[in-house]
Amino acid sequence: MALISQLFQNYSFSSQERFLQYVQIDTQSDPLSNSSPTTEKQKNLGKVLVNELHALGISNAELDEHGYVYASLPSNVEHEVPGIFFCSHMDTSPDCSGANVKPIVHPNYQGHDMILPDDPQVVIRLAEHPDLVEQFGNDIITASGLTLLGADNKAGVAEIMDAVSFWTQHPEVPHGPITIVFTPDEEVGRGTDHINLAKIKAEFGYTLDGEKRGHLENETFSADYFRIDIQGVSQHPGFAKGRMESALKIASEIIESLPKDHCSPETTEEKEGFIHPTDMRGSVEEAQIEFILRAFETEKLIEYVSISLPKV
């Protein structure tokens, strides 16, 4: 530990520089796509990562047809050591634009309002985000106000790449076999659909996709997605009595019927699951509502649907 601490003192960390580069590469996934990856542009970041890994001397780094990046470092100790792997996802949420991201570094945060220049009405205030009190003195990175930043999970990608850089620069630091995996399509629930487990020679693994430094989670929820398609009956408004059936009104009634005090993200915590409408669109003639489901017990996923939407 003393050796590593000393090396860290002299090491030029690159995670911030890498992060600022990665977030400018659009990698939004698409829940409506049937391809794998759901968007080809996710491979653009994968190609960058493979090239950087090759430059670090990791010659086995590869990007497969489904958009997964695999790389491994051999053990550098003579005795047998359990393998470990580190994983992060490259895609960003489809809920907000990931194109033309302009990251902004706010240095030495002291509790002041952070105004995002491309939309001055978007202001990050300490009073509205009390967890920021723990970041006094740190640099904070935001988007410019019009896009997603993409810290979920390009922060994890940058951290892993920085760690690989450290290991390759300091082979005197002992370690067992290490596998690196970067995945596509996590944001749309397909991050492991085509993962090649044969390439992961590890007995333990960590996904770097959490919260603040020092926070460790040892379990996660089950997840699912579903969509309700509503077919209405369109008529000229002047002759609609007894004929028109508005798909939009039906969709609104479905949303209104959802629980107000439970089974929703804004009313749950810890291991409480939820059903959450993420998108609604349509017209009088037809409408769609998209939902995500989360539960720590897989069998409860369908239970939340039957409880929340008994008439659908």
Predicted regions and their residues:
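Predominant activation on well-ordered alpha-helical scaffold segments within soluble catalytic domains
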Residues: 16, 20, 47-50, 157-165, ...
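Short amphipathic alpha-helices in soluble, non-transmembrane regions
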Residues: 86, 303-312
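A common structural junction motif
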Residues: 90-91, 260, 309-312
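Midchain, well-structured core segments that form catalytic/ion-binding scaffolds
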Residues: 138-151, 170, 185-307
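Active-site metal-coordination/substrate-binding segment of hydrolases
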Residues: 80-174, 182
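A non-catalytic alpha/beta surface segment that caps or lines the substrate-entry region
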Residues: 34-81, 85-87, 91
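N-terminal capping segment at the start of a domain
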Residues: 2-6, 12-40, 141-142
